[in-house]
Amino acid sequence: MQIIEITEPEQADFKQERQIAVGIDFGTTNSLIAIATNRKVKVIKSRDDKELIPTTIDFTNENFIIGNNKGLRSIKRLFGKTLKEILNTPALFSLIKDYLEANSSELKLNFANKQLRISEIAAEVFIYLKNQAEEQLKTNITKAVITVPAHFNDAARGEVMLAAKIAGFEVLRLIAEPTAAAYAYGLNKNQKGCYLVYDLGGGTFDVSILNIQEGIFQVIATNGDNMLGGDDIDVVITQYLCNKFDLPNSVDTLQLAKKAKETLTYKDSFNNDNISINKQTLEQLILPLVERTINIAKECLEQAGNPKIDGIILVGGATRTPLIKTELSKAFKVQHISKRFRQDEFKGEPAGRIKIREHRQVLQNSLVSNFMEYAVDILSDIDPDKAVVWGAALQAENLTAPHTNSLLIDVVPLSLGVELYGGIVEKIIMRNTPIPISVVKEFTTYADNQTGIQFHILQGEREMAVDCRSLARFELKGLPPMKAGNIRAEVTFAIDADGILSVSAYEKISNTSHTIEVKPNHGIDKTEIDIMLENAYKNAKIDYTTRLLQEAIIEAEALIFSIERAIAELTALLSESEISIINSLLDNIKEAAHARDRILINNSIKEFKSKIKKSMNTKLNIIINDLLKGKNINQTK
């Protein structure tokens, strides 16, 4: 889910002690924790003076070791996944295979002499960050704003929140990583337009199109590759060094490759003993990887409808590679680049908050930029490793400082709804609706003497339940037996500020109610979300036609049921010829419904209404017309 910021009216000043809250970027490769005071952000270092803490969890006996680059890696990839999904995804299975018991039936890992869930293991990273912050700040810290990928659904979000809660944090808010980066650049203040957030981390690549209008943030498209990152650049360089200089494929060679990559960000050549590599060679090696990211960014823009881009925000340490800016300049006709770091930026010595505008010649590339006929800025004056945690820290201060007059809310990434009779989806909360939100809708029964209503909660953009993702099912029981359509059940969909959905149903006559908190037992990654949206766009016409057909069939079935019941109750008012006419007309409707021909169904219903009006006696005509009024499909099984 994405973030929206709403500024509330000015309030009277009053004294209030500020609560300490931190921002946390729980990354796939590295994690950071920071605190903001008076809009100035400080990234908190570990005992060994590191700001970037490797997101690795190891153990000796029952003691956990965080950040030693050993043990379990990339645990973030596992959030919201089922054991089945992991077993069927080689890249995920490789992460846990050394910790998973053979023939295990649930997702628990043998870790520190215990059987632990993913959230329990991930909690150790949060505990480590919390301890470092408390040690540095010399105070207890219990509140945090935590960033998550824009594509994380409520299952993955819930697992992040659980891990943080186990660690002793009260999660003030989960915010989308691209929004945090934009907030770090101050784009929430009097900025309008669309920004492309290019996030190349160690293990993943994410790109988002962020629309900002008067302080309101909305992620309108996301794309990426969960298996592409700066680590892949290191691997390519390592392979080159091994082949060119006959080096072993070892950790030492990998470290040498990283050093070469970092040096070549500000020098034309790298030399070490008998090893040498120049900038041109490096760029030739990694160009295919960079081009992959550019193509993914183009696809994301197309998904968003090719809006005019006002700026590109760079996130992730791998974006320091000069070739990335060069290729972005070609693809997006960059006007100028804002830069903050000196040549020694890899040594952790930022050159202060000085923006040096470097005007660069626009390089045309018809293959990638023919749809981009305008100039944009590349924003890179904040350390790309820290941009996300900066935004989180600023949001944490915003939510706890006594002078704050802002409120952060999210938006729903995929529509939420309920299955109606006939398998049709009634969308209750639409995609990109700001939250928290509560929506009430009324539903009724379809059959006589129905004492229960089953509710099937769905997620997705398709028109039919079979094409959407099932979230949960529940039944409202104990309803009084009444004729179809007489029961009225109020159904409330409510999403809180952290994106957790609860659904409640209430029937007034029997005073019966039921509430369920929807926590899906599996998550959706960005690829699945993209596929769901793409399928919705691709099948929109077919889905609409299918829905219209199903609605016509339901209307036909409802009419047939009502008229046949009326005939049984009003036999004394009807002559044999009238009954024969009605049955003949109903047979036509039945045949049309059986043939699944929408036009034929609609024409048969029109013919029925027309002939009934002409041939029936006045009293019966009134009764039947009453039966035909007010029919709708808001009926559940």
From Swiss-Prot:
InterPro entries cross-referenced by the UniProt entry: ATPase_NBD, Heat_shock_70_CS, HSP70_C_sf, HSP70_peptide-bd_sf, Hsp_70_fam, RPE3
Keyword ATP-binding: yes
Region: Insert, residue numbers: 335-376
PROSITE patterns: HSP70_2 (PS00329)
SUPFAM superfamilies assigned: Actin-like ATPase domain, Heat shock protein 70kD (HSP70), C-terminal subdomain, Heat shock protein 70kD (HSP70), peptide-binding domain
Pfam families: HSP70
Keywords: ATP-binding, Nucleotide-binding, Stress response
Top-rank lineage group of the source organism: Bacteria
MF GO annotations: ATP binding; ATP-dependent protein folding chaperone
Function description: Chaperone involved in the maturation of iron-sulfur cluster-containing proteins. Has a low intrinsic ATPase activity which is markedly stimulated by HscB.
Stated family: Belongs to the heat shock protein 70 family.
The protein's name in its UniProt record: Chaperone protein HscA homolog
Species, as recorded: Rickettsia felis (strain ATCC VR-1525 / URRWXCal2)
Annotated gene: hscA
